[in-house]
């Protein structure tokens, strides 16, 4: 019964034991004491002593509970003790085992069990002192390579852990005094194995090694080499205490015996160091000497043999009681969560084998998954000893929703608001308020469109510049009733067609004037009249009308129509009607030259328009004799002359004579040219127009018939020679034929000529709008040389009673002048300078009519001829 009770109590205590944490709760100090003649205070040089605080509370700790202090990067405890008690006030509350890591694990540990001294109403606190050395590598094993990067020279933080409680302190480690480029030697004692780890690295070759042989031998020393523990590799770096931090394979050949190990290698790249290490057993000797083989050839250098010997001090194992015991290391898988090292009970008197057992937890693999949620969950799939358990970690993640808003700042901000209770977080994006935009459309010379956006800083105004190719333009000329010209431009949207509408004055309402001619009987006279002008005009056309017959004014019945027909090379048909009480007559124009004689024709492109009341006034615009341009209703040629003939209608005739001067026609034949010459003085203020390449025209306009009631022409109005006028279109500057620099070239815009005939005391103004057809007039050479470009028209003064008169022509050149400017029609009475020499054998001269320098008609009344007669008597 008693035995059953004891067994039951043991089972209950085991079943109720638990793992507690947080017993070691403070890192009070960490100091170093030189345990030998070490030249520097390195982490692997003994002895480092840590003072750790602990506390046990009976409320949470019970007998049999366990707790552990893990000490990462600690190599071994520097003591012969295998355990230590936690004592307070002379009482032991826990017993702890000292588990050195050595080459087995990356950490040492202190594992403790609460004793029965601890009761529920007891609380104990105290400190424990632990001597040890740190592990910073020293071989090619996985444990040493991991620990080779635990610390660096200088200030470091050392941290120990008791479950989820961590305690830390800082420490200052000194760097090795051996140059890293020199050969490196190391021997470390493994107390639990009574062995030493020997490491060798040859000198550094900065550019790499071509070949070499490295190794060591224990021949003659009694020490043996464990070939199963040999590591060979190359490292791409050393830590501050000259231990390899990595191990990579390379091309080598290894030879190992119980007394020596040799490694021959080739082609080690730059930046790498070859090394070899092995466990050495050195028992029953106080010291032993090692022979090191060190032969190497650096890249680009000759082979070097730097082999040497070195003596290491050994020690005797005091635990076995006898030397030469066998130490067996076994590994056993347990269900614990940490790895532990334990020594099985050993009696040196009876046991020859000391067993060190490594308790390794069941290996586990961790699988991390994720889900939309808030908390992290863990689940473990257990496995029996010898298999691998699985730990599944389910990590939550949140989805996000983005909210964008505007603000007055100048930058974009993004803020994530994490929801602690839900899986949806909010991302708030604040963007600057948009700038206002101004769009400008402009035209440029390219054939394609572009859009440029200029973004201003926040708070400014953005600009969008649209560049469009230019629209095509269609120009239309229209005629209207106003007396002035206008130009209207209609700009279409991009891609359309712009329109330019030019409205010019239509001459359908040409005005007329009334004049009564008186017949004066005056003797033959010869004289000159000079009228000085005070106003200059831009254009000058001089014509003289002489030897007008006596006639009386009478109305002429004209159809109410106004039709101007474009002409061909040989003829012109003109019907002019009466509007607003104005009367018109049809006029036939005769052109004469020495080669072809006189023909009733008009050059192509010319327009004849006439208006009259009691006195018939004919205005002829002559242009484009070579047929290069066509005129239409209301248009004028860019070059030409304007002549005005005034006559009084007489008895109508039923037929237009086709052969002037033939018997029975009533029209005298053309007289022979007069030898008298008309001269023109220079007009002050007249424009100096350069010579042009246009041929002047000699033009004679003959009024020899009237218009009947139905528009047909009648018989000649008088038997006297026809009214003859002549206008020089162009002439060379200061030439004999154009000394006054006068020209008849049209320079205005296209349109009809509006002739305003004022009373006899006023001046009628003829304004010739220009056109843009660029027509050129071809003249006749009246000197008998035929057609000649560049000749100046000759004024033919036809004398009365078959009195001859002739003026030879002079050749000159010039250019046509044309423009599209519009000139208005204006009636102004201004005296002009006009030098005119008149020679006549007629006794009766009713009236003379001339163009002044500005193109106005000057009608001289009867009293002027009386004055001329008186002057001729005196002279």
Curated annotation (Swiss-Prot):
Keywords: Cell adhesion, Cell membrane, Cell wall, Disulfide bond, Glycoprotein, GPI-anchor, Lipoprotein, Membrane, Repeat, Secreted, Signal, Virulence. It comes from the Eukaryota. Glycans are attached at residues 542, 626, 789, 811. Residues 546-580, 619-837 are annotated as: Disordered. Residues 853-875 form a propeptide. A lipid is attached at residue 852 (GPI-anchor amidated aspartate). The keyword Cell membrane applies. It is a lipid-anchor; GPI-anchor. Disulfide bonds join 73-150, 96-112, 205-298, 227-256. SMART domains: Candida_ALS_N (SM01056). GO terms for cellular component: cell surface; extracellular vesicle; hyphal cell wall; plasma membrane; side of membrane; yeast-form cell wall. PANTHER family: AGGLUTININ-LIKE PROTEIN 6 (PTHR33793:SF2), ALPHA-AGGLUTININ (PTHR33793). Each ALS protein has a similar three-domain structure, including a N-ter domain of 433-436 amino acids that is 55-90 percent identical across the family and which mediates adherence to various materials; a central domain of variable numbers of tandemly repeated copies of a 36 amino acid motif; and a C-ter; domain that is relatively variable in length and sequence across the family. Belongs to the ALS family. Cell surface adhesion protein which mediates both yeast-to-host tissue adherence and yeast aggregation. Plays an important role in the pathogenesis of C.albicans infections. This is Agglutinin-like protein 4. It comes from Candida albicans. The gene is ALS4.
